[in-house]
C-alpha cells in the first residue's frame, strides 16, 4: 500500500479483516441499495479487494447478469478468488482503473469504493469509468476525506503526528469532499452525494477502528515514518483510553451516485 493499490499478503489479510466489520458490511449494503441492481445488469466492480463486493452483488442479480471484478493487487485477487470461485457469473481479473480492459459502453452499473483516492491520474481513471458505462448507466463512487477524522487520544499531539504520517498512504487523502467537479468534467451527472460516517466507541476486534489502528501502525513503522516505540505507545494509549470507556472515533466518507447521460 502507499502510492499504489498493490498490497503485500499481510496487508491484504489485514484489509480483509476490516471488510468483515459491521461498518464495512453496512457500507456495502448502502452501496447496493443506492444502485438498485436489476436482474440482468452487467456490473463492473473496480477495486474489488478481497471479493466481498462482487460476491454480494451476485446475490442481487440473476444468471442473466454478470459481474466483472478487477483489482490491481495479486494478493487481493487471491483472496477474492477464494470467496467468489463458486459463483459462475463473476469474472475476476487483474487490471488498472486508468486503462480498463473493456469495450466502450459495456456496463449497466459500476462500483468504485475507496479506489480513486489511491490513483494519481484521477481524471483518466474517471474518464475510463464514463467510457465503459452504457448511456443511462449508473455508478457509485465512494471515497474518504481524512480531514473529517475525529479520534480521541490522551496524547493528541502524538495522534496528529501519526495521522499526518499515514496521510501519504494514498495520493488523494481528501478526495471524498472534492470529487464532484472531477466527475462532471468527464461527462457524468452527479445525482446524489451522501455522507456515511463510521462511528466506533469501543476498540473491540470487530470494529473498524481496531483494524485501522493496526493498519496505521504497520504502515507508519514499515515506511520509517514513525518509530516502533512511538507507534506502540500510541496503540497502548488507545487501549488504555478504551479500558476507561472513552474511545471515540468518527470518520466521514462520501458516496456519489452518478449517471451517464443518455444523449
Please describe what each predicted stretch is.
Residues 1-41, 52-56, 60, 76-79, ...:
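Conserved class I S-adenosyl-L-methionine
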Residues 2-18, 191-247:
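C-terminal helical/coil "lid" or tail adjacent to the Rossmann-like core of SAM-dependent
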Residues 44-46, 50-99:
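Class I SAM-dependent methyltransferase SAM/SAH-binding core
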Residues 108-121:
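A short SAM/SAH-binding and catalytic strip from SAM-dependent methyltransferases
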Residues 123-138:
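A short glycine-rich, Lys/Arg-flanked "PGG" loop and its adjoining helix->strand segment in the class I
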Residues 140-204:
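Conserved catalytic/acceptor-binding region of the Class I
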Residues 186-188, 253-263:
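Core SAM-dependent methyltransferase catalytic element
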Amino acid at each position: 500500500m502507499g502510492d499504489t493499490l498493490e498490497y503485500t499478503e499481510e496487508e491484504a489479510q489485514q484489509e480483509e479483516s476490516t471488510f468483515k466489520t459491521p461498518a464495512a458490511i453496512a457500507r456495502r449494503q448502502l452501496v447496493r441499495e443506492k444502485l438498485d441492481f436489476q436482474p440482468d445488469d452487467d456490473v463492473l466492480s473496480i477495486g474489488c479487494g478481497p471479493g466481498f463486493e462482487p460476491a454480494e452483488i451476485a446475490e442481487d442479480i440473476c444468471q442473466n447478469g454478470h459481474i466483472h471484478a478487477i483489482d490491481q493487487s495479486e494478493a487481493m485477487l487471491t483472496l477474492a478468488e477464494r470467496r467468489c470461485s463458486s459463483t459462475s457469473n463473476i469474472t475476476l481479473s487483474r487490471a488498472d482503473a486508468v486503462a480498463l480492459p473493456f469495450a466502450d459502453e459495456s456496463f449497466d452499473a459500476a462500483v468504485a469504493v475507496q479506489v480513486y483516492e489511491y490513483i494519481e491520474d484521477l481524471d483518466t481513471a474517471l474518464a475510463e469509468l464514463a467510457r465503459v458505462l452504457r448511456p443511462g448507466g449508473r455508478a457509485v463512487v465512494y471515497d474518504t476525506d481524512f480531514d473529517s477524522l475525529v479520534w480521541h487520544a490522551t496524547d493528541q499531539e502524538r495522534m496528529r503526528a501519526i495521522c499526518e504520517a499515514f496521510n501519504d498512504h494514498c495520493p488523494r487523502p481528501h478526495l471524498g469532499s472534492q470529487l464532484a467537479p472531477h466527475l462532471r468534467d468527464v461527462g457524468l451527472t452527479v445525482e446524489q452525494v451522501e455522507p456515511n460516517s463510521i462511528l466506533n466507541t469501543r476498540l473491540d476486534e470487530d470494529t473498524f477502528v481496531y483494524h485501522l489502528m493496526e493498519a496505521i501502525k504497520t504502515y507508519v513503522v514499515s515506511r520509517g515514518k514513525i518509530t516502533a516505540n512511538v507507534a506502540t505507545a500510541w496503540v497502548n494509549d488507545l487501549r488504555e483510553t478504551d479500558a476507561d470507556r472513552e474511545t471515540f472515533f468518527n470518520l466521514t466518507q462520501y458516496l456519489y451516485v452518478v449517471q451517464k447521460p443518455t444523449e
